[in-house]
């Protein structure tokens, strides 16, 4: 994304900082902290759904936002809970209802023309936690599994306030 963090390390750092700031603001206001992690694909230019209902970038398009991997979805859940979040709602649950195979190829200054795909290229997801037909994606199942793993821990985390800064760093 040209409007935010681009490397995985910078993106994770940004997510944690924003989660911590949200938790602090919610606690200061006497509110329960919620977070809205992203799980979508944003293709600029022509694209269509393939036979598995995943987005397929067509020649002339660029990938503006990519859908998080299954591992990144799990990480979003656990990292947010570790920051003190107590609620989640995802952006987005349902991907676009209709693809855009007839869209004009990307033209602009945000991305260099060399980033436009030359051949149909998978965007690695439908653009939401669910597919256009309402079926769960692997990312949706990963979020559900993470929430199921958290459930037995709820008595331990309810009422816990996170430390001001991380106790350590794992790289």
What do the predicted segments below correspond to?
Residues 46-49, 77, 92:
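Intrinsic disorder/low-complexity segments enriched in polar/charged and small flexible residues
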Residues 21-71, 98-101, 106, 122-132:
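Active-site clefts of carbohydrate-active enzymes
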Residues 14-15, 25-44, 88-93, 154-168:
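Aromatic-lined carbohydrate-recognition surfaces of secreted/lumenal glycan-active proteins
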Residues 8-22, 66-74, 139-146:
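Well-ordered, non-membrane alpha-helical segments in soluble/globular domains
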Residues 21-33, 79-86, 142-156:
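A structural motif corresponding to the C-terminal end of an alpha-helix
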Residues 1-13, 76, 83-91:
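Aromatic- and acid-rich polysaccharide-binding/catalytic face
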Residues 87, 91-171:
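Aromatic- and carboxylate-lined catalytic core of secreted/periplasmic carbohydrate-active enzymes
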């Amino acid at each position: 994304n040209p409007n935010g963090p681009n490397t995985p390390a910078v993106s994770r750092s940004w997510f944690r900082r924003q989660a911590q700031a949200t938790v602090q603001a919610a606690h200061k206001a006497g509110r329960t902290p919620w977070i809205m992690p992203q799980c979508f694909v944003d293709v600029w230019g022509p694209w269509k759904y393939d036979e598995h209902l995943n987005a397929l970038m067509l020649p002339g398009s660029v990938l503006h936002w990519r859908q998080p991997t299954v591992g990144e979805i799990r990480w979003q859940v656990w990292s947010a809970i570790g920051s003190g979040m107590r609620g989640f709602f995802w952006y987005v649950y349902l991907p676009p209802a209709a693809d855009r195979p007839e869209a004009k190829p990307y033209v602009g200054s945000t991305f260099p023309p060399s980033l436009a795909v030359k051949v149909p290229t998978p965007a690695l997801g439908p653009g939401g936690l669910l597919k256009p037909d309402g079926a769960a994606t692997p990312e949706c199942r990963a979020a559900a599994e993470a929430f199921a793993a958290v459930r037995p821990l709820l008595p331990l985390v309810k009422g816990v306030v996170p430390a001001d800064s991380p106790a350590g760093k794992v790289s």
